[in-house]
Every structure is written in C-alpha cells, then in structure tokens.
C-alpha cells in the first residue's frame, strides 16, 4: 500500500459517478460506508453543480457489519426507485463496500424493478477512475442500446438521398476538463459541415436517448479514455465507424474536419476556408518569436497530453523536453508520441516522480493538471492547466473550449500568457544593473529605506557577511555581497556579475553546474575563469 497526499485518479466508482452525474434520469445506488460520500464534493464544490449527484449510498457503519448489510442495500435501492423514479438504475459497490461481497447486481435484480438495472462490477483495487467511467459507459450502452441492435449479418441501410448525416458525440462526462464547452464547439463545427448531432452521451443524455445511438451514421469520439470501448462495440454491432482524430489544435481540427467529412460524404473545403482561428498568425508574428524553442514539459491524461505536445511542437515552436501521463491504459500511445520528440515518456501516477522530472529537466513552461500547477509554483516555473484533474478555477463561467478552432484560440492565450513576453525580457536585461530597477531595489516612490528581506536577490543568493559587519542605513550603502555555494565554494563578486549575464531561464542550472565543478575540483573561490571552465567541462 502506498500512502499519498494526492492522486491523479480516484477509485473506479468515482468514474461511474462521473457518468451517472453527467446523464439525466439515471440513478446510481452505491454500496458504500459513510466515509465514501465525500465524492459528492467533487461535483458540488469543484465543478460547481447546482444539484447533488444522482447517487444513493447505503452508508453502512461499523455497527452494521454484524447485521444483514444485504438488506441495507436492498432498502436503499427500493427507496431510490420510489423517490427518484429513474428511467434506469446502475448498482455497484465502492472500494470499501466491495470487501463485503454482497453482490449488489444480484440483489437489485431480485427486487423486480420495471426499469433496466445494470450491475457495474468494478475491480476497485486494480483499476482507477477513467477505467471505471469507460466500463460504466460501455455497460450502459450495451444494456440499453443492445436490444435495438440489428440481426447478425444485416447490412446497414444506405442513407436516403438528400438526408443530412447524423452522428453521436461520445465521451463527455461530469467533472471533465472543459467538456461542456467542447460539446458546444464541436456541435457548431459539425453543423457548419451539414451534419446533425443525434445523441451526446454520457453528458446530457437520458437512458431513453441511449436507445437511439444506433440511428446515427457514425460516432465522434471526443475522449477515448471514456468512449473508445463503447465506440468499438457500436462499430461491431451497429456497423458505425468512429473518428480517430481528436480536434485539439488547429492542425488536428483540420484533420478532424476532413475525417468527419469523409464519413458523412460532404465537402470539407468551404468550412476549412472559412475557419476563424488566430493561433497560426499570432504564433508566426514577429512579437511571438520569443516562443521559439521554449522548453515545455507536458503531463496529463493521454488525450490532452498527446494533443498538447503536437500543438507545442508544430504550432507554437516550443521544444518538448518531457511528455507523460497517469493513464496507464494509454501508455503505448504516449510512448509513441514521445518518441516523435526524442524524449522518454513518463508513465506514472506518483506526483513525486513528476516533480522530480520537472526539476531535472528545467522547463520554461509546464503544461499539466492541478498538481503540476502546484509543482510549477514551487519550482518557480510558469504553468498552464491542460487536463483533469483540475480545481474550481478550471470550470470557468465563460465559454472556454479546448477543441475546435475557437479552442485553439483559447489554448494560445492560456499557454502564452504565463510566459514572460519578449519585450519584458528585453527590458529586464537592459536595466538589470540600473540602480533603481536592479534586483532588491525598493520602488522609487518609497524613498531610500532598507530593501525588503524577501527581495528576489536575497532569495536567490545566499549572502555571507562578517559577523562584525555594521548594519548600515540605505540600500545604496550595503556592501557588495559574496555568494556562498552549498558545497562550500565562495562566489567572487566578478563571477557573480558574470553569472547575471546568463539568461535567467538557464541561470540556475549554470550556477549548480559551476558549484558542482568547483566542488569536484577542490576550487575554494569561484572566479570568472571557473565559471567558463565549468561551462566547457559540461559542454563536452
């Protein structure tokens, strides 16, 4: 067992809750102890939903373990059926509830409800949240759409001449990263192509809507982590092809439009010609040259991580120095993507490994989840969130999709704004030695007082002063500091000044390498010559 203060994915029953919460008129009866009701907060507090998830917990306590917990589950199921009157019900157990082995599926079926009751058997200690969402959606589609399936060997009828093509949008759930706005953007894009959306599922769909899935001509898979298993089943049973391209980024959206147009038998060129996106021009304009070769580290779910790496490399000119995911089921896809950029994929669900990798690679921008935001803040690196799990600020009130052409505009703004603008960098370099604007100087309107103890220069350089040195008033009268390396080597003032000429984003690495070189070679005082000797040594 591994104890941790953070997890990228919850247990699989949280994935089932995401599907149930996204749908309408579906209820989830969960055999779980009192402590597992915490999951409600994910939806009401973080996603800011205005109603509780459609989940009934049995909430058994320790005192109930000596009684009939099966009867407790059956009573909860009866009450949920009578109170909420759902069109369908899913039943299962949480990770703790599964240890009792009460068989919620069998118990619920024995109650003889007049609605479909779908047992969701999730291996709580082998799988995690995204797998639980995928399995739940697959079981729902199979149980509810299955009775409408054509007989084996039946050919799919041709669409009538002049009839608009129809598709299903598969994969969006509650608690997903920008799923609400992605649905709107992709529906609008498909409408421009003359394609109607038949059903969006799970989000917004009812069990009755799932019976109509087979009426579509093809399926659009927006989030493979949730929808790929169900889409494969629909292709096999209903002979519906499904899309493989995820429309995140300008290039991917153009490929998606062509792929969808091919499935629907329509011309994509008018839509592509009229596409409104500013990312290509902004990223090629003169004032965006500072983006070129910015080192970026990317970590998230496989769908968003792979798409983000492509945008970073091909559309913004960044250099991808790290790529990883917590989705082990999609590890092969991420490894293949990482190979294109000449990096080794990081497949892990341990945030400490991710933090160590970020510290090792010294990126200039981190793209990740809520945890990578914390990691980047600790390391002083700009960050943008690209993937779930996310916190409340990534469920904005405004329209902010990630998919489609408008999603590309949102991505450009989100990623570029945390970076230091080229003009700012130029001005900092120009005035870094100015008496008024140098590190540690007080704002001019505050007069000549002591520099604040938390000034950036004081944080960056450890100052070694003689114990007998007097305390002088006025920032201008402070003696020149002599930095001390952690290894014991002392930085000479001229070497410290030379170090400041190195660009800020690699200055920390240069300092560490020089101190390491001095320590290994027994150098007591780091001079300018030592600095360049270290540079030559590590450049070999």
Swiss-Prot record:
UniProt similarity note: Belongs to the ChlB/BchB/BchZ family.
Classification via SUPFAM superfamilies: Helical backbone' metal receptor (SSF53807)
A matching Pfam family: PCP_red
SUBUNIT field: Protochlorophyllide reductase is composed of three subunits; BchL, BchN and BchB. Forms a heterotetramer of two BchB and two BchN subunits.
Cofactor note (record): Binds 1 [4Fe-4S] cluster per heterodimer. The cluster is bound at the heterodimer interface by residues from both subunits.
Function: Component of the dark-operative protochlorophyllide reductase (DPOR) that uses Mg-ATP and reduced ferredoxin to reduce ring D of protochlorophyllide (Pchlide) to form chlorophyllide a (Chlide). This reaction is light-independent. The NB-protein (BchN-BchB) is the catalytic component of the complex.
Highest taxon of source: Bacteria
EC number: 1.3.7.7
Reactions accelerated catalytically: chlorophyllide a + oxidized 2[4Fe-4S]-[ferredoxin] + 2 ADP + 2 phosphate = protochlorophyllide a + reduced 2[4Fe-4S]-[ferredoxin] + 2 ATP + 2 H2O
BP GO terms, sorted: light-independent bacteriochlorophyll biosynthetic process; photosynthesis, dark reaction
ATP-binding keyword on record: yes
GO molecular function: 4 iron, 4 sulfur cluster binding; ATP binding; metal ion binding; oxidoreductase activity, acting on iron-sulfur proteins as donors; oxidoreductase activity, acting on the CH-CH group of donors, iron-sulfur protein as acceptor
Catalytic residues as annotated in Swiss-Prot or TrEMBL: 287
Organism: Rhodopseudomonas palustris (strain TIE-1)
Annotated residues for binding of substrate: 422-423
Alphabetic keyword roster: 4Fe-4S, ATP-binding, Bacteriochlorophyll biosynthesis, Chlorophyll biosynthesis, Iron, Iron-sulfur, Metal-binding, Nucleotide-binding, Oxidoreductase, Photosynthesis
Disulfide bond residue pairs: none
Record-listed [4Fe-4S] cluster binding positions: 36
Protein name: Light-independent protochlorophyllide reductase subunit B
Cofactor: [4Fe-4S] cluster
């Amino acid at each position: 067992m591994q104890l941790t203060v953070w997890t990228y994915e919850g247990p699989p029953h949280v994935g089932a809750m995401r599907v149930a919460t996204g749908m309408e008129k579906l209820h989830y009866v969960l055999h779980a102890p009192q402590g597992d009701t915490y999951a409600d907060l994910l939806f009401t507090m973080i996603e800011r939903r205005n109603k509780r998830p459609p989940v009934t917990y049995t909430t058994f306590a320790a005192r109930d373990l000596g009684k009939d917990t099966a009867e407790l589950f059956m009573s909860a199921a009866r009450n949920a059926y009578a109170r909420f009157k759902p069109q369908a019900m899913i039943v299962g157990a949480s990770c703790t509830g599964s240890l009792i082995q009460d068989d919620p599926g069998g118990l619920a079926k024995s109650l003889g409800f007049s609605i479909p009751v779908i047992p969701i058997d999730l291996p709580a200690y082998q799988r995690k949240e995204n797998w639980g969402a995928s399995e739940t959606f697959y079981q729902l589609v199979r149980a509810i759409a299955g009775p409408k399936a054509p007989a084996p060997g039946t050919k799919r009828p041709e669409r009538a001449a002049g009839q608009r093509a129809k598709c299903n949008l598969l994969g969006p759930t509650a608690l997903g990263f920008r799923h609400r706005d992605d649905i709107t953007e992709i529906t609008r894009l498909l409408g421009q192509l003359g394609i109607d959306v038949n059903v969006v599922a799970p989000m917004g769909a009812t069990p009755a809507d799932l019976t109509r899935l087979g009426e579509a001509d093809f399926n659009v898979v927006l989030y493979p982590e949730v929808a790929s298993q169900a889409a494969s089943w629909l292709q096999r049973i209903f002979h519906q092809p499904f899309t493989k391209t995820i429309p995140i980024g300008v290039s991917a959206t153009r490929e998606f439009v062509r792929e969808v147009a091919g499935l629907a038998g329509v011309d994509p060129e008018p839509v592509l010609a009229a596409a409104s996106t500013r990312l290509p021009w902004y990223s090629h304009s003169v004032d965006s040259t500072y983006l070129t070769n910015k080192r970026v580290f990317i970590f998230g779910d496989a769908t968003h991580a792979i798409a983000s790496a492509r945008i970073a490399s091909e559309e913004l000119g960044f250099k991808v120095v790290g790529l990883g995911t917590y989705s082990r089921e999609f590890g092969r896809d991420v490894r293949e993507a990482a190979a294109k950029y000449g990096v080794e994929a990081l497949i892990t669900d341990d945030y400490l490994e991710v933090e160590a990798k970020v510290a090792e690679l010294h990126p200039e921008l981190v793209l990740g989840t809520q945890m990578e935001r914390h990691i980047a803040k600790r390391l002083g690196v700009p960050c943008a969130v690209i993937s779930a799990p996310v916190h409340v600020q990534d469920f904005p009130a405004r329209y902010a999709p990630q998919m489609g052409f408008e999603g590309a505009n949102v991505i450009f703004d989100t990623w570029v704004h945390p970076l230091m603008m080229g003009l700012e960098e130029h001005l900092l370099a120009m005035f870094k030695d100015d008496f008024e604007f140098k590190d540690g100087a007080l704002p001019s309107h505050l007069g000549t007082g002591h520099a604040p103890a938390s000034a950036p220069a004081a944080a960056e350089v450890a100052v070694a002063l003689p114990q007998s040195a007097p305390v002088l008033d006025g920032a201008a009268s402070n003696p020149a500091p002599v930095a001390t390396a952690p290894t014991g080597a002392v930085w000479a003032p001229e070497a410290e000044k030379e170090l400041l000429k190195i660009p800020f984003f690699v200055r920390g690495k240069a300092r560490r390498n020089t101190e390491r070189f001095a320590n290994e070679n027994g150098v007591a005082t780091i001079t300018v010559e030592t600095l360049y000797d270290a540079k030559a040594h590590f450049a070999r």
